[in-house]
Swiss-Prot record:
Gene (UniProt): fklB
Domain PPIase FKBP-type residue range list: 120-206
UniProt main location, coarse: cytoplasm
Family named by the database record: Belongs to the FKBP-type PPIase family.
Enzyme class, broadest EC rank: isomerase
PANTHER family linked to this entry: FKBP-TYPE 22 KDA PEPTIDYL-PROLYL CIS-TRANS ISOMERASE, FKBP-TYPE PEPTIDYL-PROLYL CIS-TRANS ISOMERASE FKPA
Pfam families named among the record's database cross-references: FKBP_C, FKBP_N
EC annotation from Swiss-Prot or TrEMBL: 5.2.1.8
Subcellular localization: Cytoplasm; Periplasm
Annotated GO CC locations: cytosol; periplasmic space
Activity regulation, per record: Strongly inhibited by FK506.
Protein name as catalogued: FKBP-type 22 kDa peptidyl-prolyl cis-trans isomerase
Keywords: Cytoplasm, Isomerase, Periplasm, Rotamase
Length: 206
């Protein structure tokens, strides 16, 4: 396959669309896709050609490759969910860790003396979020700017914690996947069924 040049608007836009499609497919979990065949399919569709592969064969192949991806995803995420449960069990034994009825765990790093937010309040916080392997996926501290949001506009584990924390407090939260993003995850940085660890400092009720 010859390498195209990208010296026209049309070529640059076409390449950009290809990048977007490729990124979506890369994140889909579908394995074994062949770029040459993918490009051929796009070209046939754009040029209005008769499909080179019978439609029923295409549908069968698509079904099979999706089933394979689903099986791999289930196996991977079941293991991740189990790791989260084990992490929570071990974390609950640590000194200073409190567990609520919902399964939320928190450790007080610093206890403030201010007001406690209601679900209807808007708050300003600093936070760092990690996966249980220590990978940081988001941090207002690293950005150097606190985050502001309504209490009832975040994940359930955060809502519960914020409505227990006095202003001025800094807590470490360990949030079961059921109180976080559950089976859907959140983009590429938070896989499905992830138990999450946050260090949260409640700065102000707005």
């Amino acid at each position: 396959m010859t390498t195209p040049t990208f010296d026209t608007i049309e070529a640059q836009a076409s390449y950009g669309i290809g990048l977007q499609v490729g990124q979506q497919l890369s994140e889909s979990g579908l394995e074994g896709l062949l770029p040459e065949a993918l490009v051929a399919g796009i070209a046939d569709a754009l040029e209005g050609k008769h499909p080179a592969v019978p439609v029923d064969v295409v549908h069968r192949a698509l079904r099979e490759i999706h089933e394979r991806a689903d099986a791999v995803r289930r196996q991977r995420f079941q293991a991740m969910a189990a790791e989260g449960v084990k992490y929570l069990e071990e974390n609950a034994k640590k000194e200073g860790v409190n567990s609520t009825e919902s399964g939320l765990q928190f450790r007080v790093i610093n206890q403030g003396e201010g007001a406690i937010p209601a679900r209807t309040d808007r708050v300003r916080v600093h936070y760092t979020g990690k996966l249980i392997d220590g990978t940081v996926f988001d941090s207002s501290v690293a950005r150097g700017e606190p985050a502001e949001f309504p209490v009832n506009g975040v994940i359930p584990g955060w809502i519960e914690a914020l409505t227990l924390m006095p202003v001025g407090s800094k807590w470490e939260l360990t949030i079961p996947q059921e109180l976080a993003y559950g089976e859907r995850g959140a983009g590429a940085s938070i896989p499905p069924f992830s138990t999450l660890v946050f260090e949260v400092e409640l700065l102000e009720i707005l």
